[in-house]
Amino acid sequence: AERSVAEPEIVLAESAHAAFHKGAHLFGLRTRMVPVTDDWTVDLDAMADAVGPNTALVVASAPQYPQGVVDPVAEIAELAAGVGASCHVDACMGGFVLPFASIEEPDAWGSPPWDLAVEGVTSISADLHKLGYAPKGASVILHRSRRLRRYQTFDFDGWLGGRYVTPNLQGTRSGLPMAAAWAVVRHLGMDGYRHLVRSAIGSADRIRTAVRAIDGITVPGDPRHHLLSIVSDTSSDEPIDVFALGDALAARGWHHDRQGPPDGLHLTVSAGNAVVLGEWLEDLVAAAVEARAAAPGSATDYATLE
């Protein structure tokens, strides 16, 4: 409203989470999607072409969900600031991983600046109920200033019931998830999160190494943290159908989200997976052998359908 933008737009990569499109639909915003490059981060040249006088928000992901790589946040924030737009960093998956990863293994697991230390970043989201290890229903959004935060609040005093103020779409919510999240964070502390992050990324590193050692499948891009995908290796003489691999793993009790394009199996690795990792790695090898001779598998939906 302050810039008098009549038809506001969100500029985001095709790798940005689908929830942004849901939000745009709810609020009547237009989305302008830009492609990713060969390393699966946003194409900055295409994003520069997409931002303009109607841009209200530019999105960066730290990391993006499908391939698990971190967008160049500083460059994205600079593009947003150049047109007077906000820049939101989706760190729902990385907010409780990236800070501790940089402490544990700065060379191997570190990331370029992505948080509010980056000039031009105006807000960050981080999910406590993911790698914060809190129960479902707890997340945070951090605004750079109180001035920006006030736009989130709905304030109405034009009915007979008195003033109604709410900072979210859901209205009144249970305090239980917040209390549980507070308890988890207090219990784990810095040392606890460092230990959990080391376990999660250590397991993910073993998975990446094992997948890339099997002819016919690979891990795309250079994900350094706990998210990754498994895809068919099209450079192989015998590429494996990745959904057939998913079927073979499912038959052994391992169920993975299926995504695309490109067709892939998505893995979110947490510290809790470490105890079964050895068994999973053995089954991966057996499933790959089975998938070579199998008919193509089928995709599923990342959603809840009626």
Regions found by a protein language model. Name each.
Residues 103, 107-226, 231-236, 305-306:
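Active-site C-terminal subdomain of aminotransferase-like
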Residues 42-91:
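Active-site phosphate-binding strand-loop segment of PLP-dependent enzymes
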Residues 44-46, 70-82, 94-123:
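Active-site pre-lysine segment of PLP-dependent enzymes
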Residues 194-197, 204-206, 213-215, 231-306:
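Non-catalytic terminal extensions of PLP-dependent enzymes
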Residues 1-57, 77-78:
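PLP-dependent aspartate aminotransferase-fold enzymes
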Residues 27, 82-83, 214:
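Helix C-cap/helix->beta junction micro-motif
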